[in-house]
């Protein structure tokens, strides 16, 4: 690793549920907790509404890693959205491995509105994991090989 590589910081996109994870991130900011600033947050109504194509598009457009975070099981504002997200994520993760994307580049977690310290800890961990993988080089450019599988993942429960 040369000096330029040690200065490299990963670009991470975080899709956060409005009701829990985004509120946890907000509380972390208000509490002035320290965590890496290279995460770009996208607030979504529910983790269950995150289409797998959003994750792939983020990777295609230069993100080195993606974090999806929602409410804890049983606490979803929309009753079962986080369960749908967990099912989709499990399938998507296997598809990404199939096309050669390292599993650590895309991560899923639960964070409640009161868990500011947990949010900061997760951001530090995701950043360290993605940094250890290095810059994303091989990403999906042509979805034709997995388009059928991705459309199956997008089916609503």
Features from the language model and the residues they span:
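Iron-sulfur-associated redox domains of electron-transfer enzymes in respiratory
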Residues: 1-157
């Amino acid at each position: 690793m040369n000096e330029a590589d040690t200065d490299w910081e990963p670009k991470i996109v975080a899709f956060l549920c409005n009701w829990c994870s985004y509120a946890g991130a907000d509380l972390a900011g208000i509490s002035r907790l320290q965590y890496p600033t290279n995460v770009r947050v996208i607030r979504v109504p529910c983790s269950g509404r995150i289409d797998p194509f959003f994750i792939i598009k983020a990777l295609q457009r230069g993100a080195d890693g993606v974090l999806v975070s929602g409410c804890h099981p049983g606490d979803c504002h929309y009753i079962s959205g986080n369960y749908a997200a967990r099912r989709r994520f499990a399938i998507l993760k296997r598809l990404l491995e199939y096309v050669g994307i390292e599993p650590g580049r895309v991560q899923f977690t639960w964070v409640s509105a009161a868990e500011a310290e947990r949010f900061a800890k997760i951001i530090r961990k995701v950043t360290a994991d993605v940094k250890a993988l290095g810059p994303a080089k091989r990403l999906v450019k042509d979805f034709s090989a997995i388009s059928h599988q991705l459309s199956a993942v997008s089916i609503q429960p």
